[in-house]
Amino acid sequence: MAPQLLLCLILTFLWSLPEAESNVFLKSKVANRFLQRTKRANSLVEEFKSGNIERECIEERCSKEEAREAFEDDEKTETFWNVYVDGDQCSSNPCHYRGICKDGIGSYTCTCLSGYEGKNCERVLYKSCRVDNGNCWHFCKHVQNDIQCSCAEGYLLGEDGHSCVAGGNFSCGRNIKTRNKREANLPDFVQSQNATLLKKSDNPSPDIRIVNGMDCKLGECPWQAALVDEKEGVFCGGTILSPIYVLTAAHCINETETISVVVGEIDKSRIETGPLLSVDKIYVHKKFVPPQKAYKFDLAAYDYDIAIIQMKTPIQFSENVVPACLPTADFANQVLMKQDFGIVSGFGRIFEKGPKSKTLKVLKVPYVDRHTCMVSSETPITPNMFCAGYDTLPRDACQGDSGGPHTTVYRDTHFITGIVSSGEGCARNGKYGIYTKLSKFIPWIKRIMRQKLPSTESSTGRL
């Protein structure tokens, strides 16, 4: 019986073999469904692994959302996506004149430097006097949608419409004798943004004056005038404006009864023993506030500290006697007073309460921002004043320099920008020289210089 049962089982197994074989081999459509590669989901660990952007968007095509997940930063994502979609539009450097290119999808954007415009920054902008002074050498003004350059008196506008050409041998503001690799400055210094200068050497030259200026060689400060009293000698300075007008400080006029003028000299002993130029008339600003009036009426001392001296006979110009140029108010404010330094000169004391210098001294002084100026001063600083000088270095104008020139050089031309006026002592730490701001008085100066007055006995007037 057992053998029969075994045989029965074997026959049943053999009968079922064809059905089993047919089930092993699947139809092609069904098989393809199993062989298709399905995109695996990113694991949490993978999302935070470095190099994840390569797996997401280089090995495979990704969406912007997936790129954002990889970068975790909107700006980086945007930069990547603009290049990823259609390539880098900035690769050809399409922006001219150092413009900065930013790629976009199907486009790019150029951010132009100041003075340039256009899609590719290809157009040079000289249409604004606020951009490099309109490329004008001297004065710039807007005329409709354009700019117009002009020059100081005694100069001719160049054929290019921008440059200024000296029209004579003694045009204003030009040093006929220039320094030979020598600055009207001092030992080496490094300037900080708040006009505090850091010394490179602890041993300044022993032969430095104004307070700590340098000798102004003959012909290097040709606009310097010296005001002389017959008893006191040189007591103030001035600036030559024209053959018959000299600019000075109003408070100098109150210091003496008799005033004479000397020009073209750098040695005080020669000034006080040589020929003097006679004064015809003196114009003192009618709003000038002397210290005694300031204390009495609670006003700002030395406000409107400006005066003009009219000579009896014209000053003879030479290589040692040249006027400083008179700027326009806008040129002074927007261009000159935004330079780093101005230049002052005089025969004043070599230190506070010290002796006066025997020779003409000159010093570069940095402009000081208005807030620092006002905070540093115990007396009011009005809109008619500005500060210049050093925070901690002992370099300053001093008593006896009053009325003298503060000039600023632009394109090798010296323009008068201030008058030495006042200050708290000389070269004190944290204190600056205070100057009359010339740009406030251009109309007043021009009004006086336009007058054609006959020669009269010496007199003082107020305008």
Swiss-Prot record:
Location in or out of the cell: Secreted
GO molecular-function terms, A-Z: calcium ion binding; serine-type endopeptidase activity
Protein known as: Coagulation factor X isoform 2
Residues recorded as bearing 4-carboxyglutamate in the entry: 46-47, 54, 56, 59-60, 65-66, 69, 72, 75
Domain (EGF-like): residue spans on this chain: 86-122, 125-165
Pfam families, sorted: EGF (PF00008), FXa_inhibition (PF14670), Gla (PF00594), Trypsin (PF00089)
Tissues showing expression: Plasma; synthesized in the liver. Also detected in the venom.
Principal EC category: hydrolase
Catalytic activity: Selective cleavage of Arg-|-Thr and then Arg-|-Ile bonds in prothrombin to form thrombin
Residues of this chain annotated as glycosylated in UniProt: 92, 254
Domain of life, per lineage: Eukaryota
